[in-house]
Regions:
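Generic structural signal for buried aliphatic residues
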Residues: 38, 89-92
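Histidine-anchored nucleotide/phosphate-binding helix
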Residues: 121-133
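Ferredoxin-reductase
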Residues: 2-85
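Conserved beta-strand elements of the Class I
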Residues: 110-113, 217
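Ser/Thr-glycine-rich phosphate-binding loops at phosphate-binding pockets of nucleotides
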Residues: 115-121
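A short, basic/flexible loop-to-alpha-helix module at the beginning of a structural domain
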Residues: 95-105
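Short, conserved phosphate/pyrophosphate- and ester-handling motifs at nucleotide-, phospho-/glycolipid
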Residues: 35, 118, 221
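Reductase modules of NAD(P)H-dependent flavoproteins
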Residues: 2-3, 141, 148-258
Length: 258
């Protein structure tokens, strides 16, 4: 029995020359939790070429969505960036990962801290009704280099608040903090700096991030993961995992897969 489903590409969106997303069909047997990743890829010379990708779509949706960087000499993304509607993609049957609400202790606010394509799992998490049932406020922070790399910005700010089922909760509970490092923008600087200086809390008018009330999910570059882990621990937050819930969780399975 194969470890993969073969899916068909339904749409492709190129955000920039370095960033694209795509949707595929979804086998009815595929089950996952919001925040999970799975192995996806292409068959090259008859063999599967795979990388770990977070699932950006919610687990109740009939299609799958993925967000990817383009690396010209990357074994997979150099090929994946050229996919077109109707092409075949292979998708692993066993999604997994640590960015699940179940791996966090109860809290008042949920911070979702992402850089680059680390946003993908949080697009799934912010479309989960349970997220808003368990936390009073959900704070999505996305750090990129250039404004055009703020994938899903318009969807988050304009479409999600009108969502048929989640719109009211999202309008009242979701706070979005996009930040850019290489261009003038309303929020500038690295995510790590914004956390360290309590810049986010000030801008969103919430208390400084603290162990008593806040829970955190982190997904991004290895440097960002390392720095934020140290900052969380300095503030007294304890890391959780698949066996022991904690105050923050980190996805280490991949760092911008190529």
């Amino acid at each position: 029995m194969s470890a993969f489903h073969e899916e068909r590409v339904l749409s492709v969106h190129h955000w920039t020359d370095r960033l694209f997303s795509f949707t595929t069909t979804r086998d009815t047997a595929l089950r996952f939790s919001n925040g999970h990743f799975t192995m996806i890829g292409l068959k090259v010379d008859g063999k599967p070429l795979l990388r770990a990708y977070s699932i950006a779509s919610a687990n109740y949706e009939e299609t799958l969505e993925f967000l990817s960087i383009k690396v010209q000499d990357g074994p997979l993304t150099s090929r994946l960036q050229h996919i077109q509607v109707g092409d075949s993609i292979i998708v692993g049957k066993k999604p997994t990962g640590t960015l699940l609400i179940d791996y966090l202790l109860p809290g008042k606010r949920l911070y979702l801290l992402a850089t680059g394509t680390g946003l993908a799992p949080f697009m799934s998490v912010i479309r989960d009704p349970e997220t808003y049932e368990k936390f009073e406020q959900v704070i999505l922070v996305h750090g990129v280099r250039e404004v055009k790399e703020l994938a899903y910005h318009d969807y988050i700010t304009q479409e999600l608040p009108k969502h048929e089922f989640l719109g009211e909760m999202i309008s009242q509970q979701l706070l979005y903090y996009p930040t850019v490092t290489r261009e003038p923008y309303k929020h500038q600087g690295r995510v790590t700096t914004a956390i360290e200086t309590d810049q986010i809390a000030k801008a969103l008018n919430v208390p400084p991030l603290n162990a008593a009330e806040d829970r955190v999910m982190i997904c991004g570059s290895p440097e960002m993961l390392r720095d934020l882990k140290a900052m969380m621990e300095k503030r007294g937050l304890k890391e959780g995992n698949t066996t022991t819930p904690g105050d923050f969780v980190i996805e280490r399975a991949f760092a911008e897969a190529k």
